[in-house]
Amino acid sequence: MLPRHSLIPAACAVATLLASAGTMASSHREAPFITGMPKVDGTDFYMFNSYESGRDGYVTLIANYLPLQDAYGGPNYFSLDDDAIYEIHIDNDGNAEENITFRFQFNTERRNLAVDVGGTSVPVPLINIGAVTGQNNDAQNVLESFTVEMITGDRRTGNVQNLTKAGSGDSSFAKPLDNIGTKSIGDYEAYADNFIYDVTIPDCPMPGRVFAGQRQEGFVVNLGEVFDLVALNPLGARDSRSNVIADKNITSLALEVPADCLTGDNTVIGGWTTASIRQATVINPGPQGSDTTGSSNAKGPAVKGGAFTQVSRLGSPLVNEVVIGLPDKDRFNSSEPKDDGQFATYVTNPSLPALVEILFGVSAPETPRNDLVTVFLTGVPGVTQLPTVTASEMLRLNTAIPATEVGAQNDLGVAAGDFAGFPNGRRPIDDVVDIALTAAEGFLCGADVNGEAAGGEIGSCGSQDMQVNGGAIVNDGALPDPANYLTRFPYLNTPLPGADNVAVAE
């Protein structure tokens, strides 16, 4: 057995990890249907107590979408979907239904900027025709903006109110241009800071902050070897391989909210993100107008209508990627936590440890995996359990556990004694792949995270009521680098530029 003090981290991490017991890009292209809709593909969800200096008492929520962006991906780059809604849901009473939802909706304006060519004004094919700054976007051909609504109660029938810019009442926020290159945007970090807004949140006495825009991918994984039948040394050095998605960008929807405006009767909250699109799409065989000529008789390439229908869902990392079986991946993306009983077998009898046993001869923990059910579906008593216990998959955070300062954070989170990390919420630095692999191999079997105090029992692995496989740290060889993250909101790093022209002669 591990020392009592080291079980809490592991316990929290176990559920989330075990569920994702494999290792891969947290939720990038994880289900067959969503691979054809990258703009609404949720890739990672972070929820943690803010650790920026002076932000005690705040919770940061980050939902990432549109995976594996190449920085040079012009000429259109990576706008989000105007015909979709992107949502972050909070359950603060434990009934596996949202009590609060933050809904992001985007709007794209095409200016149809033109240049004179032989006396004829001709629209340009690029999204900018010159340098752009936070104060001057005259050369920007495509503008994105967004609104954020707070819905209390059911996401579709509850009370809807707008978040607004603090001091102005304006409910429209601008999204920065993607990082095209240093000639178009000279200092992208300073440029993007202009799009971090202080916001007034309905029924909340303190302001929050919001940002939506491109960031450097923060998830770390040795992707290719993991998916090639785990072609790596799982007990080797944690930095023996490379993070193959380190050169990718992502689009983040980031929101910072006072913790007291999220919690219910105790200090634990559950969270997840979803994206929904219109139910029907009709393709226009002869598009014209707004996307081409700017005609008043604009007819775009498609007409969309009908009710919004959920196509992406993400709470704890890696769940749909490596826990849910292939036949049910699309179903999981369309489901809600309150209905997660239908997926229970994937948690009680996970396939990943069995696959590892076949590939490496390492004995899989016995089933049923009651340890995973506790940490992953119900929360750990006294740590991440909500007032009402409803078995459901979501990321859980105890807002009363103080944030760990940047220099003291451990990327193994709770498993290494850093109780402010995964699976008590999830920070950008948390190496969820290593945590998940370790938990999957029985790290938490029979653990009691509260020692002699009441509660804290994790549960057994079948008849095994103590740690399995010696508590080894199983890893993919890709290690997070603290230098690749910001120490302030929105925490994920400045996106990589599509071109670095600093050495190009004028």
Segments and roles (model prediction):
Residues 11-18:
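Hydrophobic helical h-region of N-terminal Sec-dependent signal peptides
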Residues 1-11:
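Bacterial N-terminal signal peptides that target proteins for export
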Residues 24-506:
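Surface-exposed extracytoplasmic segments
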Residues 20-22:
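N-terminal signal peptide c-region/cleavage motif recognized by signal peptidases
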